Regions:
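Intrinsically disordered, low-complexity, charge-rich terminal extensions
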Residues: 1-183
Length: 183
């Protein structure tokens, strides 16, 4: 694929990253941070202090918000009501008692600034394989989340219900219990 085709492909699909991060934030708030992967594994996603939201023209219509709890923030919800979507999110993934702090970029689903859990023990020969395994775990968690999102996004009826649920969350309205379906 030539550079021009790659750039055009990235431009055409970038909206999926923003929809994914916005969905992930709404689901994190709705389901009290708990996610279930297609494999059946569960883990928590906690949005941390900084979140960036972009409108249709990110060069002119961008909000960088630093709030204690982004999923509960009225400023974040107002930006979403104004048509913005999450474009950069700092998150904490909690899986099997381990915490992974990282930033996810919507443009390319890039993972940045990953902070891994500390290794137990002092064996320097074991450190690198251990850290590589942790990086693989982080990548697998985010890929699993994205796969769940894409499956939902490709099902017109399920996506319609999910968009309605996200809208109720954005408007701070109660969400009926029947919508607590895992994806």
């Amino acid at each position: 694929m030539t550079e021009i085709h790659r750039a055009e492909h990235a431009r055409r699909t970038e909206f999926l990253g923003r929809e994914f991060l916005t969905w992930m934030m709404a689901r994190s708030a709705r389901d009290r941070e708990s996610f279930k992967l297609p494999s059946g594994e569960t883990f928590d996603v906690v949005f941390e202090r900084a979140v960036t939201l972009d409108g249709q023209n990110p060069a002119k219509d961008r909000s960088l918000l630093k709030v204690d709890e982004p999923t509960e923030s009225e400023e974040v919800r107002l930006s979403l009501r104004l048509g913005k979507q999450v474009s950069v999110a700092r998150v904490n993934l909690i899986h099997d008692g381990r915490e992974f702090h990282l930033t996810i970029l919507a443009a390319d689903l890039g993972l940045r600034g990953i902070r891994l859990p500390e290794m137990e023990g002092d064996d320097p020969d074991a450190a690198m394989p251990f850290r590589m395994d942790l990086c693989d775990q982080v990548e697998a968690l985010v890929q699993g989340l994205f796969l769940s999102f894409i499956r939902l996004r490709l099902d017109p009826e399920a996506w319609k219900r999910e968009v309605a649920s996200i809208g109720r969350w954005v408007d701070n309205l109660p969400i009926p219990d029947s919508e607590d379906e895992a994806t």
